[in-house]
Amino acid sequence: PKENLKSLDIIRVGTSGALQNDIPVDSFVLSTHGLDLNGMLHSYQIDSIKNTEVEEAFIAHTNWHQNKAKPIIIKNSKTLEKQFESEVTYKGLTATAGGFYGPQGRVLRLALQDSELNHKIDAFNHNGLRVTNLEMETSAIYGLSKLLGHNALSLNAVIANRANGTFSKNPGQVVESLIKYTLNKIAG
């Protein structure tokens, strides 16, 4: 192992679907927290990075099934949040699903374990903290970064809004706009 460890700034720039009707497609979401729904972080010693109060509120609100991995909520880097927030960013908790189909509430021919789970996630609000969007990376990035001593932030180009049933007409453009926004914020 290295003797002198270096703290990195890790910025995820990706796409996601908005879960709230007031977050339009083609907008940007800055993730204040990552919500690990898949249990990946349970492989590590996570007591120092958990947010037990919010996690317990989420579990109670959703009536989380006991056979699923216990949700974990991890905060972003407040330093990076201050650097990247602006009047064009929406902020909130980003749910991180462990897959594309059932884990995100998509129904094919198989019934979901909890057909109301997406609605419960959308309706969660703990002291103003609500789940704004859904994707598959943020909680792992936040959790591993915190455990390894790095700073992390997730920025999301909203290409769909589940609450409104709307989709970006030009998702490539919103992704490009977010990349430029991110680079400009890095450059200062």
What are the language-model segments listed below?
Residues 1-72:
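Metabolite-binding pocket within alpha/beta catalytic cores that recognizes anionic/polar moieties
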Residues 139-171:
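Zn-dependent metallopeptidase/amidohydrolase metal-coordination segment
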Residues 1-8, 124, 130-131, 171, ...:
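Non-transmembrane, aqueous-exposed alpha-helical and coiled segments at domain scale
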Residues 17, 95-102, 140, 159-161:
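Glycine-rich beta-alpha junction loops
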